[in-house]
UniProtKB/Swiss-Prot annotation:
A motif (Nuclear localization signal) lies at residues 34-38. The lineage of its organism: Viruses, Riboviria, Orthornavirae, Negarnaviricota, Polyploviricotina. Residues 223-230 are annotated as: PABPN1-binding. Gene3D superfamilies: Influenza virus non-structural protein, effector domain, S15/NS1, RNA-binding. InterPro entries: NS1 (IPR004208), NS1A (IPR000256), NS1A_effect_dom-like_sf (IPR038064), uS15_NS1_RNA-bd_sf (IPR009068). This is Non-structural protein 1. Keywords: Eukaryotic host gene expression shutoff by virus, Host cytoplasm, Host gene expression shutoff by virus, Host mRNA suppression by virus, Host nucleus, Host-virus interaction, Inhibition of host innate immune response by virus, Inhibition of host interferon signaling pathway by virus, Inhibition of host PKR by virus, Inhibition of host pre-mRNA processing by virus, Inhibition of host RIG-I by virus, Inhibition of host RLR pathway by virus, Interferon antiviral system evasion, RNA-binding, Ubl conjugation, Viral immunoevasion. Residues 217-237 have a biased composition (Basic residues). Belongs to the influenza A viruses NS1 family. GO terms for molecular function: protein serine/threonine kinase inhibitor activity; RNA binding. Changing F103L: In strain: Isolate MA20b, Isolate MA20d and Isolate MA20c. A motif (Nuclear export signal) lies at residues 137-146.
Length: 237
């Protein structure tokens, strides 16, 4: 087994332990906790593959990090921090759109993972645009702050927001929630578009028709919805 592979795992285990202490002291935000959860799963898998005990690896990782820090100069640390990537905050919505209260005539609420989806089922035959405010790192969506669905008249008819009780979410959580919101709005013959900014950083591309590519799971779900609606329409006739 390559020694660098082992030492990398040991250091990762110790750094995860340090980050866990930050969360335990309630000093970490939602993206921090999200990465912590994902890295925990990754470390368990790597430990199993390498045949290494995580607790023992953490202790050795601590020794490696302490040795490096003892040799690290303040100037080198400043240069490392300066070159580290920083997340950006992107805004589709204005402050007014972000903070505006809205009401639903026929409310429907669904929890999809760590995200809450709200839809006004009374809205029919409208052109709707999905806008979002979110942070980006490495040109990918990092954390969703808030997503809202707007009619051409500016009315809010849907929303996706993180659940305070379940902090942390992945980009896949966001895309799945958007698929559910689109399906719910299209049920009532609304035409839904997604902002180019959100398409670019969530899916890595933007389509002129404003529709992001759906996952196979979302396609199957929407197909079942369409078949169910067709059967209901036939029964009504």
């Amino acid at each position: 087994m390559d020694s660098n592979t082992v030492s990398s795992f040991q250091v990762d285990c110790f750094l995860w332990h340090v980050r866990k202490q930050v969360v335990d002291q309630e000093l970490g935000d939602a993206p921090f906790l999200d990465r912590l959860r994902r890295d925990q799963k990754s470390l368990r898998g790597r430990g199993s593959t390498l045949g290494l005990n995580i607790e023992a690896a953490t202790r050795v990782g601590k020794q490696i990090v302490e040795r490096i820090l003892k040799e690290e100069s303040d100037e080198a640390l400043k240069m490392t921090i300066a070159s580290a990537p920083a997340s950006r905050y992107l805004t589709d919505m204005t402050i007014e759109e972000l903070s505006r209260d809205w009401f639903m005539l026929m409310p429907k609420q669904k929890v999809e993972g760590p995200l809450c989806i709200r839809i006004d089922q009374a809205i029919m035959d409208k052109n709707i645009m999905l806008k979002a405010n979110f942070s980006v790192i490495f040109d990918r969506l990092e954390t969703l702050i808030l997503l809202r669905a707007f009619t051409e008249e500016g009315a809010i008819v849907g929303e996706i927001s993180p659940l305070p009780s379940l902090p942390g979410h992945t980009i896949e959580d966001v895309k799945n929630a958007i698929g559910v919101l689109i399906g719910g709005l299209e049920w009532n013959d609304n035409t839904v578009r997604v902002s180019k900014t959100l398409q670019r950083f969530a899916w890595g591309s933007s389509n002129e028709n404003g529709r992001p590519p759906l996952t196979p799971k979302q396609k199957r779900k929407m197909a079942r919805t369409v078949r169910s609606k067709v059967r209901r329409d036939k029964m009504a006739d």
